[in-house]
Amino acid sequence: RKKQEKLAKEQRKLSRCKKGSKNYFKQLRKVNKIHYAITNQRKDYLHKLTTYLANNYNVIAIETLNLKGMASKDGFKLGKSVHDVAFSYFTSLLEYKLNDRGGKLEKVDRFFPSSQTCNHCHNKFPITKDLSVRQWECPNCHTINDRDANAAKNIRDEAMRLLGITAPIKAVELEGNSGIVCR
């Protein structure tokens, strides 16, 4: 985000320059240099993350997301954050690195009710469609489920079902906001 702020500052300076002047082109080079640095920073992080995942896991399950809807103003109001993640680039990097190492990237359909299904008793509860509900208790088995962790477990289980895997899979554990702990 620091580079984004610097970019905004330099773009404001550029907008004040007279188009076609020597100072305009000097400022344009500065703006382009920051764009280039941001792109390289993002690519470097994604390459390091996907290499780590591909080296440590044979099967990775992800949910296909409606990124266009998430980025739209009427959607989830995550616009800049969704674009900063470069999810499509991430999945393509991860897929080719897993293929090179003999692994598999399994994509679970976005309409699969991952956050609405209890991972313990597999009953579906549409009340959890509301995104503000972060934890919920299953009325059937009385298990308290964290929305994200429960969804991650359901995506893992669905991917295992799609692949025909019955043996347990080592779960991905990432630090911070970059992932969900799924056991």
What are these regions (language model features)?
Residues 1-91, 165-183:
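Substrate-contacting helices/loops that form the catalytic groove of nucleic-acid
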Residues 81-183:
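Positively charged, low-complexity nucleic-acid-binding target-recognition regions
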